Amino acid sequence: VKAWKEKVVIPTYEVGKPEKNPIFLEKRVYQGSSGVVYPYPVIESMSDEKVDKEYDAIFIENEYIKVMILPELGGRVQMAYDKIKQRHFIYYNHVIKPALVGLAGPWISGGIEFNWPQHHRPSTYMPVDTAVEENADGSVTVWVNEMERMFHQKGMAGFTLRPGHAFLEIKGVLYY
């Protein structure tokens, strides 16, 4: 199993600038959430023009599958490819085109995203911290994590790829 960092270019519709002042509860109730996002900045606009944007990706690969993780976009699994059947096994969106449906604005479809403390977390379109572990059994784990600012919880997702296995193991860890 190998892991590496690589710059990738993905056509992207850029988001607008965040509101300069914090937005407190203003009846922005969304799918059962309170609507509160403070202290996160809210973005309420996006570009209609597509540009090629460079992202720092982390790849993990074995003889069966290849996975791309995007730390700059919330640590989501953007792409997972079955090398034997020669097809993606999760929805792979080749363009980053946010919709303003997330708690703090931008949210993108495709891949696998992780949400804590609630769905479409406010930071789903923000960078997260990462660490890569090479395990004794030859497997590799990529950890993505953040200290969530609303409730001060640390959330982590670990993606492990093992030699000789055709699946991605995912482990979630929450500290509160």
Say what each PLM segment does.
Residues 67, 80-81, 92, 144, ...:
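Carbohydrate-recognition beta-sandwich/jelly-roll modules
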Residues 24-52, 57-61, 109-167:
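Extended, loop-rich substrate-binding clefts of extracytoplasmic carbohydrate-active enzymes
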Residues 2-37, 57-61, 65-127:
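Acidic-aromatic substrate-binding/catalytic surfaces of carbohydrate-active enzymes
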